[in-house]
């Protein structure tokens, strides 16, 4: 299983990369806005510069989302983003216009991430259109009393049935159990906020054991 970090914060990306477990990065307009703050406008050029800065930190794929809602606009923005670095993956929503853009990008050898996926039928269409990745949002489904992990199970089963090469990125991850369940189901990737990466590392018995070992080690003369 691959781990992506779901953030636009450069410090968090660097910290995750230093752990040696980071395979890629996903961003979206909300994460970019969080980094930009409200002090000044975040221009399109500033957005592209920020994606370029992320690409300098990581070796793996970096997903950057288009903001246009029509296929032509998505294609124009996506081509600009793809020109930044060969690692850039264009995130497009699974809409009628988004599927057109995904199909275009597939025909032109530009990687795509079909995002805002909440049903197996959306994931099936994304794979048929040629998406490189598909991102079902498990946490947001859980928020509306729907089993997000069941969606992952359905998508993985469908893709295996028909040998689709589209990879499943489990997105909107809220806690470490989401990651464990995704791994057990067989999802290709989990994209994880930095706080959840820290949750994956932490266990109270590890901390208690380390405390005891440290106390006992104090009697050893070096």
From Swiss-Prot:
Q: Which GO terms describe its molecular function?
A: aldehyde-lyase activity; transaldolase activity
Write down the chemical reaction(s) this protein catalyses: D-sedoheptulose 7-phosphate + D-glyceraldehyde 3-phosphate = D-erythrose 4-phosphate + beta-D-fructose 6-phosphate
GO cellular component terms?
A: cytoplasm
Task: Please indicate if the UniProt record lists rRNA-binding as a keyword.
Answer: no
> What Pfam families does the database record attribute to this sequence?
TAL_FSA (PF00923)
Disulfide bond annotation, renumbered to this chain: none
The record's section on InterPro entries has: Aldolase_TIM (IPR013785), TAL/FSA (IPR001585), Transaldolase_3B (IPR022999), Transaldolase_3B/F6P_aldolase (IPR004731), Transaldolase_AS (IPR018225), TSA/FSA_arc/bac (IPR033919)
Q: What name does the UniProt record give this protein? A: Probable transaldolase
Q: Which HAMAP family match?
A: Transaldolase_3b
Q: Which UniProt keywords apply?
A: Cytoplasm, Pentose shunt, Schiff base, Transferase
Function field = Transaldolase is important for the balance of metabolites in the pentose-phosphate pathway.
Question: Where in or outside the cell is it found?
Answer: Cytoplasm
For this protein, what is the EC number? 2.2.1.2
């Amino acid at each position: 299983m691959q781990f992506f970090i779901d953030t636009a914060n450069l410090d968090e990306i660097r910290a995750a990369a230093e752990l040696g477990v980071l395979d890629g990065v996903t961003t979206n307009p909300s994460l970019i806005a969080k980094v930009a703050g409200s002090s000044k406008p975040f221009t399109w050029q500033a957005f592209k510069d920020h994606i370029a800065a992320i690409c300098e930190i990581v070796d793996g794929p970096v997903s950057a989302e288009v903001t246009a809602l029509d296929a032509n606009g998505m294609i124009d923005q996506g081509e600009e983003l793809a020109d930044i670095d060969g690692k850039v993956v264009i995130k497009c929503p699974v809409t009628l216009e988004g599927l057109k853009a995904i199909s275009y990008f597939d025909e032109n050898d530009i990687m795509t991430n079909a995002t805002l996926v909440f049903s197996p039928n959306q994931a099936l269409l994304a794979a048929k259109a040629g998406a490189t990745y598909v991102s079902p949002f498990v946490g947001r489904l859980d928020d509306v009393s729907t089993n997000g992990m069941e969606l992952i199970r359905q998508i993985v089963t469908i893709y295996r049935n028909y040998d689709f090469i589209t990879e499943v990125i489990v997105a909107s991850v809220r806690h470490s159990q989401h990651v464990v369940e995704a791994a057990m189901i067989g999802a290709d990737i989990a994209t994880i906020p930095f706080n959840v990466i820290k949750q994956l590392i932490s266990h109270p018995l590890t901390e208690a054991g380390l405390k005891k070992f440290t106390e006992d080690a104090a009697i050893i003369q070096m």
